[in-house]
Amino acid sequence: MRGGFGRFTQQHPIFTIVKGGVGGRNGLVTLSLSNTDPLFPTFPNVLPGFPPGATLPARSIQEISPDLENEHAWQTSFGVQRQIGSRTSVAIDANINRGVKHGFLDMNAPTPIPKDQLNAALASNPNAVIRTQAQADQTRPQLPGPNGFRHMDVLTNEGRSWYQGVRFSVIHRTTPLTVTASYTRSDAEDMLNHWFSPENSRDPKSDRGPTGADTPHNLVTSWSWNVPGSGAVLGGWRVSAVTHSQSGAPYTIRYAGDPVGYGLGVGAACNSRGCQASTPNGRNTARGMFINYADLTMGKQFQVGADRIEFRADVFTVFNNQNLLAGGYINLVGNPRFGQHTGGSAVLPSRQFQFALTYRF
């Protein structure tokens, strides 16, 4: 029987501090100028500084809450293990984790449009615009104007994470053979992230969803066999294998463009960490296919006096089956290829061979 309880913490990630300094109201100003604009610089001249009293369009900023605290998590674990005979043991372990983490919130977010109204309005044309940016700006707490701000993302302590999982494992050992199997059933969710604000900052809880690493089912088996034999040719061989089968990662289904006038358009961030774009059902509601692969290893030791030579051959993804990553699925509602996979770099490597020879002295 075993168990534990503890609080774990970490220091502020430096890039979030840099964001607050560079992307804040007194940080960098990004603007676009046409080549006909009087302020457009001519090589080798550089863009001059803004003159006193210059009027700038409303911009978006990222700042840090003055009461920001370190991220931390409370973790509880409990497990039991039992020996069955002299060669087999079984174990059950449970783990619960509750975390408090950083998360951006847009303190000047427009009034959200309810999901049922959004989906009904876009049912016939998923690429339609049901509210312009100007109309959305009218619903912001602070109206964007000259020298003002549109998005006011503030890094807060409102982020949360939840994890609970149970792992079942068995180990069987004999003189030539060792076999292990482990199955984990788990659930991992989080809310907000320290990269960008969510789809609806006025209701942070609506961002709660599976984490990008959520793996409800995870089965790993392995075996290692010392092949019987003796002599220079038949002795010293070992064959081992590992099989892995797990749930595919989640991903978010979203609408293209900016149907509600949020102001980010096609540049809206949307990945496994979070989603600023408009979604029909929320974050990480779809899931990729199961990931399955098997690796095989064969090795032999040769004794050379007091020294040893080790030969090893590895085959990764023995069955050469295709494993599709969640980031490759086309997730735009209305896209003719919606739900299909793009392949390419979003596919785990196919079968690979590796050979090694080691001399130990």
For the regions a protein language model found, what residue spans apply to each?
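Extracytoplasmic gating/loop element in the C-terminal half of outer-membrane beta-barrel translocons
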Residues: G49, S230-G305, E310, F316
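Gram-negative outer-membrane beta-barrel transporters
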Residues: N95-A232, R238-Q246
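Hydrophobic, lipid-facing positions within transmembrane beta-strands of outer-membrane proteins
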Residues: I64, W74-F78, Q164-F168, H217-W223, ...
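Residue-level signature of outer-membrane beta-barrel architecture
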Residues: R7, R82, H172-T174, W225-V227, ...
